[in-house]
């Protein structure tokens, strides 16, 4: 049974995730996006130093993905002590929040380093065997065009 302090902390975290309406709803009655919010809230309850996000946006619709990315961006800004490892096949999901990263292909490192060192057309071509053109928007988002 949670203590009053834990209940207060949980309510604050759920409010910050705009998910307070989910506090009494069974997980099986939640959408995939709602479940992601609850999982992030559960992780934040422990004040982690490290969060591993393994394909967190895979089942989310466009609105859910945008919310997730904004949440991650806010966490990066408000929790400088929190290291997040974000595993994804959607490179646009990790911008503009990642400081450093790597691209893997068949378990081998294709590139590692800063965002600008990693996200190059050459590295992406080597990783995915595709002719890719990168286009960065003014907000730091990245779009890929396969030629």
Where are these regions (language model features)?
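Conserved ABC ATPase signature
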Residues: 26-30, 34
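Conserved ABC ATPase "signature" region
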Residues: 4-22, 47
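ABC ATPase nucleotide-binding domains
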Residues: 126-147
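Catalytic Walker B motif of ABC-type/P-loop ATPase nucleotide-binding domains
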Residues: 51-55
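H-loop/switch region of ABC-family ATPase nucleotide-binding domains
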Residues: 88-89
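Helical segment within the ABC ATPase nucleotide-binding domain
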Residues: 66-80
């Amino acid at each position: 049974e949670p203590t009053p302090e834990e209940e207060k902390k949980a309510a604050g975290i759920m409010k910050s995730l705009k998910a307070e309406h989910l506090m009494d709803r069974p997980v099986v009655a939640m959408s995939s996006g709602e479940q992601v919010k609850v999982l992030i809230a559960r992780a934040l309850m422990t004040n982690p130093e490290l969060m591993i996000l393994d394909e967190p946006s895979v089942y989310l619709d466009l609105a859910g993905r945008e919310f997730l990315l904004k949440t991650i961006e806010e966490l990066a800004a408000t929790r400088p002590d929190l290291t997040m490892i974000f595993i994804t096949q959607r490179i646009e999901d990790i911008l503009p929040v990642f400081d450093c990263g790597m691209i893997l292909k068949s378990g081998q490192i294709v590139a590692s380093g800063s965002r600008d060192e990693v996200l190059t057309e050459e590295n992406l071509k080597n990783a995915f065997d595709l002719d890719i053109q990168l286009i960065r928007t003014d907000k730091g988002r990245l779009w890929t065009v396969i030629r």
